[in-house]
Amino acid sequence: MVRRKKSKQACSKGLNQRLKEDRISQFYESLLCQILNYLPTKDVVKTSVLSTRWRSLWLLVPSLELDSRDFSDFNTFVSFCDRYFDSNRVLCINKLKLTISENEEDGFYLKSWIDAAAKRKIQHLDVQFLPQFHKIHFNLYKCEALVSLRLFEVSLDKGRIFSFPCMKTMHLEDNVYPNEATFKELISCCPVLEDLTVIIYGMDRKVFQVHSQSLKRFSLKRVSSFLHEVALSGVVIDAPLLCSLRINDNVSKSFIVNNLGSNDKLDLSILFGLWHFDETSVTSMRSSIDRFLPGILSVMEMTIHSPAFMLMYRYLALIPLPHLPKFSYMSRLSVTLGVSDLQFLPTFLESCPNLKSLIMESNSNSKRMLLNGNYHINFSSVPKCLLSSLEFVDIKSSILVYVARMKLVKYFLENSTTLKKLTLRLALRLQYCSAKDEIVKKLRKFPRISKTCQVGIVFD
């Protein structure tokens, strides 16, 4: 009797212990789904073996991320997805990411999956094809609840009419569009679109047009390694609410940008399809640059990369000083350049009469010039902004050899009448060596035309 009583007590104690250990299973279903939503899908599915309570719980998780490479073979992946999207237990799909690494010509499976997701009011869709461009015919036009869309290496169907009344974010990377109208329609059918990223396959020869009354941020990348073999069409951007524009394009020969305002930010790396920047080459593209510049002259902040800087300098050098186009609203300029480009900086700054802040960084040619000892620079003029508006100069001197660096610092200290602070950023390794002391001594000897100017050295 005593032994039986002890046995019951032991069983009761073990049961209580298990209940304590599995308190998470006592949570409300909605809370469990929220917890599972933070886990990778393959781990979420594994919870189905924990107990009867957990067997179908993963089907209620509103986010799904599936990669065909996580399955033993592609047929197993398709079979799993078919069962999932056909399940009556799946009531809501908020977010779906599909990564597919097989080249199935018809893509029959994807159409039914997207249809199923559309019926469940999917809001975030990400489809990636890894091996190559994939020709599919899935019904994007049915996904009217979409808020964000990402397509990677997808070949879109011809003649579809899209409607995305809720779409705010779109990322289109290396996709194939059957014609120019399809791309244009895809963008213009999003009346509340705010963020757009477009990465274009370098050899695509279409004119890409972005017309949007709601777009606020746009990033475009169109790059090819075979510049000498291409002669591609251009880009048209018309977005009156745009406040941030980033263009990295070495292929397009024509750019038209409308409606950039005085509060906008511009990140520019464009070559107008040129391989060389001699006077003859730049002159050949002058009409295209003439059409492009008026659309960006009102920007407040600009980042310009080399060799786009050299292209713009060569263009500006063709124009008499009184007729030089002016970035009158620009207050902040960040420029990437090499030692050989420094002598052209004053000419470029002539176009920025109200500039307040200037940041300079290096390009990959600077180290090569250091090894060659080729760093002769000569500043021939003092632009207006140095005499009336420039307040902050930040020189990231990994860009420069010692002589060039000190010439640049001396130039700004001697000529910037309104300068408040000049920051010289040095490599961290110089912090504890004698070169640092030599630089400090030099800086103290340089005359400063601005009595309020402070010089700071930062090691990073």
UniProtKB/Swiss-Prot annotation:
CDD domains: F-box_AtFBL13-like. Residues 375-426 form the FBD domain. Residues 21-67 form the F-box domain. Gene3D superfamilies: 1.20.1280.50. SMART domains: FBD. PANTHER family: F-BOX/RNI SUPERFAMILY PROTEIN-RELATED, FBD DOMAIN-CONTAINING PROTEIN. This is Putative FBD-associated F-box protein At5g53640. It comes from Arabidopsis thaliana (Mouse-ear cress). The lineage of its organism: Eukaryota, Viridiplantae, Streptophyta, Embryophyta, Tracheophyta.
